[in-house]
Amino acid sequence: MKTALLLEKLEGQLATLRQRCAPVSQFATLSARFDRHLFQTRATTLQACLDEAGDNLAALRHAVEQQQLPQVAWLAEHLAAQLEAIAREASAWSLREWDSAPPKIARWQRKRIQHQDFERRLREMVAERRARLARVTDLVEQQTLHREVEAYEARLARCRHALEKIENRLARLTR
């Protein structure tokens, strides 16, 4: 009974932290947030740390059910340390301005958004031309639409290639 109450309390703390961290949980930082012994994840978002803490809570529940006392003790201590670290990080988030993305990264993120918009518009144009091609019966117009579809597909391929390069560049910059 006592164990069940403690598990519920840990679950409540995790839920509270998830709500408290929700506004900033997806923001990545340039440097690691925590020591490697505390969190195994390489991601620099609070969401990844919250997910890992949730996984550890599930592992703790399983260990309690299996009555694996040494594992229960270690997992409980580790989970408590993780929750405490996340709470400290959530409290200190406003002080992390020095770790925000530099202008160079922001510029690449804008380029990514712009290229994603280009990709979406090109897909729409290809779909629209294909729909018109399916309805047209005139041979000359079919050939014209077919050339347009090929041209838009080539543009789409170049756009996707550029988007992939931008994603790779952002990945390198945020390592």
From Swiss-Prot:
Disruption phenotype: Called priC303, no visible growth phenotype. Resumption of DNA synthesis after arrest of DNA replication (upon UV treatment) is slower than wild-type, no change in survival after UV treatment. Double priB-priC deletion is synthetically lethal, causes a drastic reduction in cell growth and/or viability. Double priA-priC deletion is synthetically lethal. Keywords: DNA replication, DNA-binding, Primosome. It comes from the Bacteria. GO terms for cellular component: DnaB-DnaC-DnaT-PriA-PriC complex; DnaB-DnaC-Rep-PriC complex; primosome complex. GO terms for molecular function: DNA binding. Changing residue 89 to A: Reduced loading of DnaB in vitro, does not complement in a priB-priC deletion. The keyword DNA-binding applies. The keyword Amino-acid biosynthesis does not apply. One of its GO terms (biological process) is DNA-templated DNA replication. Involved in the restart of stalled replication forks, which reloads the replicative helicase (DnaB) on sites other than the origin of replication. Recognizes abandoned replication forks and remodels DNA single-stranded binding protein (SSB) on ssDNA to uncover a loading site for DnaB. There are several restart pathways, the PriA-PriC pathway is a minor restart pathway. Also part of the minor PriC-Rep pathway for restart of stalled replication forks, which has a different substrate specificity than PriA. priB and priC have redundant roles in the cell. Belongs to the PriC family. The N-terminus weakly binds single-stranded (ss)DNA. The C-terminus (residues 96-175) binds ssDNA as well as full-length protein. Monomer. Oligomerizes in the absence of DNA. Component of the replication restart primosome, which is composed of PriA, PriB, PriC, DnaB and DnaT; DnaG primase associates transiently with this complex. Interacts with the C-terminus of SSB; this interaction is required for DnaB loading onto substrate replication forks. Interacts with DnaB alone and in the DnaB-DnaC complex, probably 1:1 binding with DnaB. This is Replication restart protein PriC. It comes from Escherichia coli (strain K12). The lineage of its organism: Bacteria, Pseudomonadati, Pseudomonadota, Gammaproteobacteria, Enterobacterales. The gene is priC.
